[in-house]
Amino acid sequence: MIERGKFRSLTLVNWNGFFARTFDLDELVTTLSGGNGAGKSTTMAAFVTALIPDLTLLHFRNTTEAGATSGSRDKGLHGKLRAGVCYSTLDVVNSRHQRVVVGVRLQQVAGRDRKVDIKPFTIQGLPTAIQPTEILTELVAERQARVLSLPELKERVEAMEGVQFKQFNSITDYHSLMFDLGVIPKRLRSSADRSKFYRLIEASLYGGISSAITRSLRDYLLPENSGVRKAFQDMEAALRENRMTLEAIRVTQSDRDLFKHLISEATSYVAADYMRHANERRIHLDSALVLRRDLFSSRKQLVTEQYRHVEMSRELAEQSGAESDLETDYQAASDHLNLVQTAMRQQEKIERYQSDLEELTYRLEEQSEVVSEASEQQADNEARAEAAELEVDELKSQLADYQQALDVQQTRAIQYQQALQALERARALCQLPELTADNAEEWLETFHAKEQEATESLLQLEQKLSVADAAHSQFEQAYQLVVNIAGEVSRSEAWQTARELLRDWPSQQHLAERVQPLRMRLSELEQRLRAQQDAERLLQEFCKRQGNAYQPEELEALQRELESQVEELSLSVSDAGERRMAMRQELEQLKLKIQELTARAPVWLAAQDALSQLSEQSGEALEDSRQVTEYMQQLLERERETTVERDEIAASKRAIEAQIERLSQPSGAEDARLIALAERFGGVLLSEIYDDVTIDDAPYFSALYGPSRHGIVVPDLSLVREHLQGLDDCPEDLYLIEGDPQSFDDSVFAVEEHEKAVVVKIADRQWRYSRYPEVPLFGRAARENRLETLYQERDRLAERYATLSFDVQKTQRTHQAFSRFIGSHLAVAFDADPEAEIRLLNTRRGEIERALNAHEDQNQQQRQQFDQAKEGISALNRLIPLVSLLLDETLADRVEEITEELAEAQEAARYIQQHGVSLTKLEPLLSVLQSDPQQHEQLQESYVLAQNSQRLAKQQAFALTEVVQRRAHFSYTDSAGMLTENSDLNDKLRQRLEQAEAERTRAREQLRQYQSQFTQYSQVLASLKSSYDAKRDMLKELSQELVDIGVPADANAEARARARRDELHAALSTNRSRRNQLEKQLTFCEAEMDSLQKKLRKLERDYHQIREQVVNAKAGWCAVMRMVKDNGVERRLHRRELAYMDGDELRSMSDKALGALRLAVADNEHLRDVLRLSEDPKRPERKIQFYIAVYQHLRERIRQDIIRTDDPVEAIEQMEIELGRLTEELTAREQKLAISSKSVSNIIRKTIHREQNRIRMLNQGLQAVSFGQVKSVRLNVNVREAHATLLDVLSEQQEQHQDLFNSNRLTFSEALAKLYQRLNPQMDMGQRLPQTIGEELLDYRNYLELEVEVYRGADGWLRAESGALSTGEAIGTGMSILVMVVQSWEEESRRLRGKDISPCRLLFLDEAARLDAKSIATLFELCERLEMQLIIAAPENISPEKGTTYKLVRKVFQNHEHVHVVGLRGFANEMPSLPPIAAELQQGG
């Protein structure tokens, strides 16, 4: 029996508390005992790290973190290490007794992330005497050691003979070696496998029922049926390969299409260019002839245009000179019209201002009188107001003084003083020194009289002044009129000047009245003069155009001559038009006919090509449509005969294939059901027993056993009897022979041998005579010999079938070609040659075109003569009415005479217009000018003196009145009398004051009224004077401007000036129009000459170039033609229908084909290079070389073994036939490869049944497991309902869903997924692909549901869940599940590792104190029965009598922390105790 591998020890180097510690592991249970923080979990973490060094999985948490998804940042590993290099190694001895040290080098990585670097390694072949700590550390002193780095460790190990050190960069490689050496139970190929293994270790470490494992028990317990899956994958791979082959055939067919496309595009590419060059060569020849003809005609036309240019230049120079004169005249006429219009506006202004001045003069006189009267009233009112003010002031002063005197005792003195002051003031004002209070009243009367006298004198002077003002105004008005008319004149000469002006006035009026008749007469004469000048200019132009000098009297005879010439030319032009129309109609008919034939020619040529191909294919000369239809009927008959023969060959081929399939069965069974029956009966096929018989003995044994040679040899027939009941799935005759399959011989028969036959005595009364078969099939050698013959026959039939298929398809293609020809070309194929008709029509068209060109030249000359004659008649029609005007020679003198008379009349009219109103006003005032009223100023001075005298007299009278009024103040008798007098005086003063104030108020109000009125009158007067002065000045300026203008200001003058301006404008416009016309014609002529010169240069250049091209192309074309004929491709390239396409269409066709060819030859370097070279337009022969290269390339690709032609086109057709045959064969092979749904269902069911039995066997090992109230543990396996339905449908109702499994578009997996979705529409498949779902459905594990159950107390069997069990029960149940998983893994992996390897079994259990003694004993028993190692961690030694126990105590010594370890071997009877292990290494620095 193979011994199971064991873990010997665990070594920790430089871990937290362990500098270099090796734990020897017990063969069953190793217990780590110690208090909290002693290092138990660290020791287990080191073991797990060495076992699974995957940082993505490692997460060491304590039990308080159970179920947590995250712990400390370093996942619990960084904090368990010391700074520097750390190691964790496992010393293992496997089933082969090979010692292997596996472990990891760990090192903290500096940084905030608290990362740890891990490097796995293995050491093989290490001697048993050497401990792991000895090679991992180096002694530097008696009690000090140093940890070696990984390179140093490698050097030390490699220095040992026979020891191998291996470092791993991949965890997968590390685990692969561990699996091969039996360290781990399962091959961990991927991270998912490592995750499963880690979850199992983690579940055992922390105890309990792991949900991560129970949820995915199928993945842990059920092995992957790789054989079945591989069978399915191989089957699908074969189908996929078959379909890929079919797809490759389709690709090959597309390549065939590509080759056809290559030939077609190459033909289009080269033929289009070939025909384009042929067309261009013909076109270049025609173009050279056309260019030469155009060159001669252009030279002739250039000479004509040059002559026209000279003539038009001369005429343009004359028109330009005339235009300059007309522009000058027109500008003068426009200026004259502007002056006349300006003068008319000035005259209107003068008349308007004169009327305004007359009105202003009248208003000014009236306003002057009003202002004078207002001035006098103003002076009177001012005097009265001033006197009233003085009187009021005096009375107020007196009253104030009086009031003051009443208030004080000096009132009298004040009044007396005031009286004296009034007296003094009166004396001074009146100049009377002798004035006293007594004679004041007398003097008052005297001065009242003076005042009255001064007032009367003032009134007299005022009346005289008004009369003088009137006389003075009339004289000034008359004098001003004389000055306005005659200029500055002395006042004494004014009357004489005015009388002379009035005497000349009637003569001036008479001259002014003659202005209008003279203007009309002058306008008429000027118009005739201008008409005469225009007629002379027209006559000069006419003579220049006619080239002769004509007199006016000769014009009528010339007109008759030109009219007769026009009539003749008109008839000639009309006849020429009809003839030209007839030739053009004939030419159009020829062009239409040529176009029709040109459109028909490609169709006819294509029909001829198709007819030629049909003639070549059929070998018959097809001369009419009847022969075509007859040969088509012959093709149909030939096709029918060949098809019948091909079908017979196909039937024979299928029969041979059926024989081959039957003979190819394993064990020589002709019926596959015999193999199943042999397995069912526990027997062996007789053919399998004699499978090694030689080919020489095969006939004998075949005859010996006869029909029973397909029987089954069974050990005991009696055991088979019960299986025969109800047996229906078997052959009609089933032979069962009793015997030992291991030592079977033919002694059971009594045999007599004859020549080529045997007689077999079956029973006493029954014999069987059997001849040797001509083709023996008994034994593998005979079958192989027969199969070889059948293979040869099948190949021969296949070749014959292929030949017949080719003939059928060739006949069908020929028939299709005839059908296409009849449908497309039969209607035109036997018509007359359109190209011959086109050549005849082109000859006739050339003749007509030449005649038409000659006719056009002659017609052009006649039309020019006709146009010149019509133009001459038109000019004569304008000149003949002007002949009399041309003969009038006195017209200019009459115009000059009338012009002088009109100037005098206009001068008189201007004088009357300017001074007529003034003379009219002056005539009644002529007598006033005889006397000058110069005394007017003296009267004004006397009037001012009289006003002053009157004002002084009033003031003197007022002063005397005040003295008289104060006369009582001069004497006061006593105070009482003074008071009485003062009282009276007060009343009087107050009364007078009231009267004086009222008088003053009235005077002020009246003064204000008169002042306002006077101001208004003065303002009006000033405004009138200002307006009068302004208008008078403006009138003078306007009159002066009118004189400066110097043109008459009347309506007729404006009309004449406008008419003159319009006539000149019309003449100028006509001249400009003619000049512009000449300039345009000259520009057109110059442009035509330039274009003709450019055309001549271009024609000469093009002619020389095209001639050179024709010469050069001839040599190149000869080389191309020689190359085409030498290689026999002229028939394919010279496609006459392309001759009817223009160069752009052919170039476009060639370019399109070039683009397609670039894609087609992209993967062929040779053709790509040749194609690139052929793109040179200057080397057309390279395109021929490319076409030849394409044909050569396709010829080289022809398989001469299956294709019997050198023509690539025919080879492509034969290739298509061969591809069709391969497609049929592969389609048949795909049908054979397809697996039935029922077979799939049976395979999956068998696998499920096998795994259910295996789970039952695993359950038997767990029935005796007991933890607390849990008496037993088992695993239930059930088939899911939906998947069971799927299996039933696959096995019994597969016919209903053949649309899925017979689809060529779906693989079997996809069809299975579609069926599952069809049976379970309520399920959501998510975003998964049908292929993925189908692959899952091919995995039997997805059909099963696994569930762990426990038998617990009175509850019976219930589902194992942590919530329903105690902690110890859950730990024990979980451990049982893990043991079952490990066993399952070992069984699953048994075939993957060596047969002499039994892997190590080890699990963990942290915090085992939660289990009672009975549960611990159960664990020990389980480990012993299963040969499993277990590492337990507990605060105390839970079972000191069994296994090995380590007591761990963490101590601190000199600021250094280390773990003190004491080992104890169990002391039970069956296992003697070992002395304590106290040796340990002291930690070094």
Curated annotation (Swiss-Prot):
UniProt: ATP binding residues: 34-41
InterPro entries per UniProt: MukB, MukB/SMC, MukB_hinge, MukB_hinge_sf, MukB_N_dom, P-loop_NTPase
GO cellular component: cytoplasm; nucleoid
Alphabetical list of SUPFAM superfamilies matching this protein: P-loop containing nucleoside triphosphate hydrolases
Location of this chain's protein in the cell: Cytoplasm, Nucleoid
A molecular-function term among this protein's GO annotations: DNA binding
GO biological process: cell division; chromosome condensation; chromosome segregation; DNA replication
Annotated function: Plays a central role in chromosome condensation, segregation and cell cycle progression. Functions as a homodimer, which is essential for chromosome partition. Involved in negative DNA supercoiling in vivo, and by this means organize and compact chromosomes. May achieve or facilitate chromosome segregation by condensation DNA from both sides of a centrally located replisome during cell division.
Similarity section: Belongs to the SMC family. MukB subfamily.
Protein name: Chromosome partition protein MukB
GN (gene name): mukB
